[in-house]
């Protein structure tokens, strides 16, 4: 996979109100394209304008300087998200350390972060996450890490997310993050109909997340199906899961999204498990520490 650098004109995208699922106020993407090659990834869609999502990674070489400059004008603190259209801890990050340097800027500027990833490489940056938590935590966490886990079985995950670390490593990463006082949880999405949408898979993910110390599990009972994303996904289904594509075409046609036929049962099971384990299903928007808490920092 080719890796080359580009100069970005802007980095941060702001939202008038924080996202209701993830609590995010600002988003940024340090890379374009991704090395994990998940067969279902929505970022292949034409609307994102990434010409060669699976063949080339573009690195925003000036991201650190841009972020530092753009944060100076942001008067409202809120979670800055990494990982919306790619994984901030894809393999190239091990060598480049761009995500790590961005975390350093967030710590220095006292901005909270919500990291979304499939990789246990996030553990490399425990020290930076700890700095952000110390600088920003209080009413709500200063540093949140959500790790995507859509199936509990390592062998199945290799078919769906060929270059990402296995679920077992991701559960272990959650345990390490939680032990170090970082708010960690699971993104249980997408759940692929006819492949991952059985109750036992959901039960295992939620139970293992709780055992690892997760504070939240955010579910979605289906997958989007847009233009190039659908084409790639269906080709991979033909190669890896013969016969499943026909079930998608019969059930969903050209629909934008494919919700699992089992969604009501999965939702009922999830609600029961989340209540039993005390797991949130969203991340609340960031609330800055009050004056009395700031005095203790």
Regions found by a protein language model. Name each.
Residues 110-111, 182, 214:
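A structural motif
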Residues 1-13, 176, 194-297:
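Auxiliary Fe-S-binding modules of radical SAM enzymes
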Residues 152-156, 161-163, 176-198, 221-224:
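Conserved strand-turn element in the central/C-terminal portion of the radical SAM core barrel
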Residues 101-102, 125, 173, 187-191, ...:
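Short, hydrophobic/aromatic alpha-helical segments in well-folded domains
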Residues 80-81, 116, 184-188, 217-221:
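Short beta-strand segments at enzyme active-site cores
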Residues 1-146, 150-158, 167, 171:
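Conserved Radical SAM active-site core
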Residues 95-97, 128-131, 160-162, 200-202, ...:
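Short, glycine/charged-enriched secondary-structure capping and boundary segments
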């Amino acid at each position: 996979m080719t890796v080359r650098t580009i100069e970005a004109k802007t980095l941060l995208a702001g939202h008038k109100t924080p996202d209701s699922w993830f609590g995010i106020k600002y988003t940024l993407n340090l890379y374009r394209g991704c090395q994990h090659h998940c067969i279902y990834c929505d970022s292949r869609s034409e609307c994102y304008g990434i010409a060669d999502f699976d063949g080339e990674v573009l690195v925003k070489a000036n991201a650190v300087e841009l972020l530092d400059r753009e944060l100076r004008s942001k008067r409202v603190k809120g979670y800055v998200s990494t990982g919306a259209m790619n994984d901030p801890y894809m393999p190239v990050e091990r060598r480049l350390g761009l995500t790590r340097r961005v975390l350093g800027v967030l710590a220095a500027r006292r901005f909270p972060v919500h990291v979304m990833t499939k990789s246990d490489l996030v553990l490399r940056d425990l020290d930076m996450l700890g700095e952000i938590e110390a600088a920003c935590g209080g009413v709500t966490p200063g540093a949140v890490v959500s790790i995507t886990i859509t199936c509990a079985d390592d062998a199945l995950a290799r078919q769906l997310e060929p270059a990402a670390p296995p679920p077992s490593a991701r559960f272990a990463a959650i345990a390490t993050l939680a032990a170090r006082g970082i708010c960690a949880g699971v993104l249980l999405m997408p759940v692929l109909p006819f492949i991952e949408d059985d109750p036992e898979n959901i039960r295992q993910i939620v139970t293992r997340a709780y055992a690892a110390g997760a504070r939240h599990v955010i579910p979605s009972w289906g997958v989007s199906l847009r233009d190039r994303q659908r084409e790639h996904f269906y080709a991979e289904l033909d190669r890896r899961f013969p016969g499943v594509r026909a079930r998608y075409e019969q059930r969903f046609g050209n629909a934008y999204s494919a919700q699992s036929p089992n969604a009501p049962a999965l939702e009922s099971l999830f609600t029961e498990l989340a209540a039993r384990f005390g797991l949130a299903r969203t991340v609340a928007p960031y609330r800055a520490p009050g004056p009395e808490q700031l005095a203790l920092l």
